[in-house]
Amino acid sequence: MTVAVLIGTTKGAFVMRDDGKRGDWTITGPHCDGWPINHVVGDPHSGQIWAAGGNGWNGAGVWRSQDGGQTWALSKLSNGDMDRWIKSDPEAARIFGVTEVEDAPFTGDLEALWSISSAHGRLYAGGKPGMLFSSDDDGKSWQGVEGINAHAERENWQGGGAGLTLHTILRDDKDPAKLWIGISAAGIFASEDGGATWETRNRRSNEDAAAFHIHAHEDGLTHGSDTEIGSCVHNMIHAGDNLIYQQNHHGTYRSTDGGRSWSAITEGLPSTFGFPIAVHPHDPATIWVVPMNGDMQGRYPPDACAKVWKSTNSGETWTAMTDGLPAQNCFFTVLRQAMAVDQMDTPGVYFGTNSGSIFASFDGGQSWSEPARHLPTVLSVETLTY
């Protein structure tokens, strides 16, 4: 079997492939014309790869490769400032070698895409500001999911530090009608009818409240309550059936009922703050997180010492993993989508940093190597095992 590590960065997508033994890696890129790529996923059956991204200049879109990342085609969902400039000055655009494109369907509504998911023959893509789209033709065309895009509570949603972003999309392996999304900072939403209707799922379990549930943020507002966790969800991972793990702005959580209630599993970690969370593909009780020192303290590893924390009992206890990671003067950030595992029997664990490194472990996190460095800021890491 071969593993491909799919990397989204501020300067395009990269693909890192192994030699079949995860010992010798090659990397290609940057792909996607240097667009900022927030998320890259692949289909192990067809080999297709999709990269979602964009910004105010480029617009928003999904790049698709049908040959493992060698060539790419763009499906644009919204136009950007560059497209307006091309229309206003076609002669200058010709000199720079760019050509006018057709008006994209969601121009004026959508700024960028932040997440993409492939399952059951359908793609979903999440965007900014807090929008969801679907495609049934491998990403060639896209439709808005109005159940969330026209949600009755939408006018009350508040954005996180990066704005109102729909950054996480979870799918149920068995039931294509079930999905969960995370929006910063509106919270978690779930649908069981293919996206037609949605309900919020931010309720705490009935356990006693911990101090970090109720958080006075720098904006002067209180986040979380005696009955709800804070709505600034950073990342979620589906571990099968109704088991979901979540890294929140204000702690790490576990749900055993499909997100209908959340129990805190932060005790034992050095911080309530972090971005990614990953789960073992064959053992739903094994998870990894990378805590940062806090939202206002620099967002780097506590004590400037890189550590990946692992639990083998669904978050009841945690163990720090440090071998091979920077032990001092480490000020990188690991962003919300920048950690993943492959599907091998002994899965590889990978994470990327905003300083451009990819770290990998092939023994469950006990030891780490750095198979890639000096990349642009790493925004996402996913794997494709085939």
Predicted regions and their residues:
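Extracellular glycan-interacting surfaces
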Residues: 1-386
